[in-house]
């Protein structure tokens, strides 16, 4: 008599998918409160799995973006400092920026006009003037799964070299700084490195 071995991982996944059917909310109405070149900000009503209705629920769409953990040939990490309106403070963070789209808008179903790696190379060059031939994709993840539908893609760039000058967008006002690994660790511990996705990027990139 032959026995078929069951893959426990597959079984658990199937059980999870079945259970998830009882967790999903159904969006039953949507109002676009703000819809301009920068954001699609919505007010929605959702139906719980048990039939109750919850409203309002606010969410938004913006374009996907990239974060680059970049280091130079001396092993120092290339960062930028700029003002962040949400917390109304100047923060230290890694070079980052949006993936370009064919229609130039921040949201919608229009296809991106560049791959994420192309976007990362462009953003690093535009913000810092540095370029690299050593790139590694670390992770693509929702930037804020609770209220947004865009994704952040994290890259590691090593042995970066100065290849040109900054070419900043009209909305960018920033300065370039270099830090050692220990200095970045200290800034994170002391709450001076305040972009959550950038802290995650650092943890992914350590030792790589």
Where in the sequence are the language-model features?
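Nudix hydrolase/Nudix homology domain
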Residues: 3-5, 17-18, 22-25, 90, ...
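Intrinsically disordered, low-complexity terminal tails and inter-domain linkers enriched
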Residues: 4-21, 104-111
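Acidic, metal-coordinating catalytic segment for phosphate/diphosphate chemistry
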Residues: 31-67, 73, 82
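Conserved hydrophobic/aromatic beta-strand scaffold that supports enzyme active sites
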Residues: 41-43, 69, 79, 154-156, ...
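Active-site-adjacent beta-strand/loop module that shapes the phosphate/pyrophosphate-binding cleft
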Residues: 45-50, 144-163
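Conserved Nudix-box catalytic region and its N-terminal flanking loop in Nudix hydrolases
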Residues: 62, 67-69, 76-122, 168-171
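Acidic/glycine-rich phosphate/pyrophosphate-binding loops and surrounding catalytic core
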Residues: 131, 135-136, 142-144
């Amino acid at each position: 008599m032959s026995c078929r071995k069951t893959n426990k991982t597959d079984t658990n996944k199937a059980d999870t998918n079945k259970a998830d059917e009882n967790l999903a909310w159904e969006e039953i109405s949507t109002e676009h409160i703000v819809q301009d070149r920068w954001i699609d900000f919505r007010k929605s009503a959702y139906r719980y799995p048990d039939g109750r209705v919850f409203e309002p629920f606010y969410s938004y769409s913006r374009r996907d973006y990239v974060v680059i953990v970049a280091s130079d040939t001396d092993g120092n990490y290339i960062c930028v400092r700029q003002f962040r309106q949400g917390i109304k403070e100047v923060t230290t963070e890694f070079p980052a920026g949006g993936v370009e789209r064919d229609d130039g808008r921040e949201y919608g179903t229009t296809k991106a006009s560049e791959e994420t790696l192309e976007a990362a190379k462009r953003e690093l060059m535009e913000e810092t003037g540095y370029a690299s031939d050593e790139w590694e994709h670390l992770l693509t993840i929702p930037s804020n799964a609770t209220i947004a539908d865009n994704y952040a893609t994290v890259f590691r760039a090593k042995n970066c070299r100065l290849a040109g000058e900054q070419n900043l967008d009209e909305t960018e006002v920033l300065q370039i700084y270099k830090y050692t690994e220990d200095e970045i660790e200290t800034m994170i511990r002391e709450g001076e490195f305040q972009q959550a996705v950038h802290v995650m990027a650092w943890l992914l990139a350590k030792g790589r």
